[in-house]
């Protein structure tokens, strides 16, 4: 299965599998305040998923694979949303840069992401290798089961 890249895999399946890999590897340090963090000021509550930090890290890695280099400001735009103001009109609002910064710092500590000299961050060869390896596993499972890619989750 050489030649299979992240671009050819369903993003939801890849993100779930990468998050499971990051959690299983134990290299990602989840900050203590992650339990109380909201992912943006447009959100009303903190995430209900206990593993949301791993999912966010996996999503950031996928984004860096496709569009690198990117900084914290770019990710606040990517994860932005609509702030509901009650009876007043809704407005566009950027996401929290604190949780993005913590995720990038955790990925840097795990040697998956590094700083780019022109600004922002990019994937390391190890991070790119991990993403490609997981994409190949997903395709192998798909061919083995002959199931659609969206139905496959490897752990």
Curated annotation (Swiss-Prot):
Gene3D superfamilies: Winged helix-like DNA-binding domain superfamily/Winged helix DNA-binding domain (1.10.10.10). One of its GO terms (molecular function) is structural constituent of ribosome. Keywords: Ribonucleoprotein, Ribosomal protein. GO terms for biological process: cytoplasmic translation; ribosomal small subunit assembly. One of its GO terms (cellular component) is cytosolic small ribosomal subunit. Transmembrane segments: none annotated. The keyword Ligase does not apply. Belongs to the eukaryotic ribosomal protein eS19 family. This is Small ribosomal subunit protein eS19B. It comes from Drosophila melanogaster. The gene is RpS19b.
């Amino acid at each position: 299965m050489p030649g299979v890249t992240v671009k050819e895999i369903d993003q939801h399946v890849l993100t779930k599998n990468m998050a499971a890999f990051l959690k299983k590897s134990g290299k990602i340090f989840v900050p203590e305040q992650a339990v109380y963090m909201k992912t943006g000021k447009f959100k009303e509550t903190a995430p209900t998923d206990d593993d949301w930090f791993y999912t966010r890290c996996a999503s950031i890695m996928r984004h860096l694979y496709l569009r690198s280099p990117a900084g914290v400001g770019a990710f606040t735009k990517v994860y932005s949303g609509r702030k509901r103001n009650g009876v007043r009109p809704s407005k566009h609002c950027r996401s929290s840069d604190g949780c993005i910064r913590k995720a990038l710092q955790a990925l840097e500590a795990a040697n998956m992401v590094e700083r780019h000299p022109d600004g922002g961050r990019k994937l390391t060869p190890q991070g790119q290798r991990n993403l490609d390896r997981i994409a190949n596993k997903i395709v192998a499972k798909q061919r083995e089961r002959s199931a659609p890619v969206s139905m496959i989750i490897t752990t």
